[in-house]
Amino acid sequence: MSEKKEIATFAGGCFWCMVKPFDEQPGIEKVVSGYTGGHTENPTYEEVCSETTGHREAVQITFQPDIYPYEKLVELFWQQIDPTDAGGQFADRGSSYRAAIYYHNDEQKQIAEASKKQLEESGIFKKPIVTDILKAEPFYEAEGYHQHFYKKNPDHYGRYRVGSGRQGFLDEHWRDR
């Protein structure tokens, strides 16, 4: 078996909720919370939350495509977000919480665009799919206390995932699929 590794980057609102779903899959080497898409080098959490850096909260995933292909990562990404929300995700509002797929090569771009089209045509959502598909930009790792938040603070993570409205939305749209 090949040890080929690739990188995938997804912005899906608060990065706390974006790590666990990917972390649990086979062939995923690591999932890092961070910031991408902005104009400030090495931004802090406070700077990103101030909406002045242009960054989005995101996760960067190192994966083995022979075990867990990029197509499956994109499919799992869609199942973690509200792709019809251009103003943020769930309780988190603002440009730093907007969803996006950041592609690292032409193949990823084509897969992401085809997947978005398929989702649009599926009828799962009544509103248009507005999630951006963008060329990957520099990714800056978030502060240590944000990394694997679901493991370090399981109770807080669980309350946040439900209280933000994320879990209810995902259950409503994906439970039976």
Curated annotation (Swiss-Prot):
Q: Which Pfam families match?
A: PMSR (PF01625)
HAMAP family from the UniProt entry: MsrA (MF_01401)
What is the gene name?
msrA
Instruction: Give a short account of what the protein does.
Output: Has an important function as a repair enzyme for proteins that have been inactivated by oxidation. Catalyzes the reversible oxidation-reduction of methionine sulfoxide in proteins to methionine.
Coiled-coil spans in chain: none
Q: Tell me the superkingdom of the source.
A: Bacteria
Family recorded in the similarity comment: Belongs to the MsrA Met sulfoxide reductase family.
Instruction: Output the Gene Ontology terms for molecular function.
Output: L-methionine:thioredoxin-disulfide S-oxidoreductase activity; peptide-methionine (S)-S-oxide reductase activity
Q: What is this protein called?
A: Peptide methionine sulfoxide reductase MsrA
**Record's NCBIfam families?**
msrA
Task: Tell me which EC number(s) this protein carries.
Answer: 1.8.4.11
Q: What is the lineage of its organism?
A: Bacteria, Bacillati, Bacillota, Bacilli, Bacillales
Q: Which UniProt keywords apply?
A: Oxidoreductase
Q: Which reaction does it catalyse?
A: L-methionyl-[protein] + [thioredoxin]-disulfide + H2O = L-methionyl-(S)-S-oxide-[protein] + [thioredoxin]-dithiol; [thioredoxin]-disulfide + L-methionine + H2O = L-methionine (S)-S-oxide + [thioredoxin]-dithiol
Annotated organism of origin: Bacillus velezensis (strain DSM 23117 / BGSC 10A6 / LMG 26770 / FZB42)
GO biological process assignments: protein modification process
Residues the record marks as active site: C14
- Which InterPro entries is this protein grouped with? Met_Sox_Rdtase_MsrA_dom (IPR002569), Met_Sox_Rdtase_MsrA_sf (IPR036509)
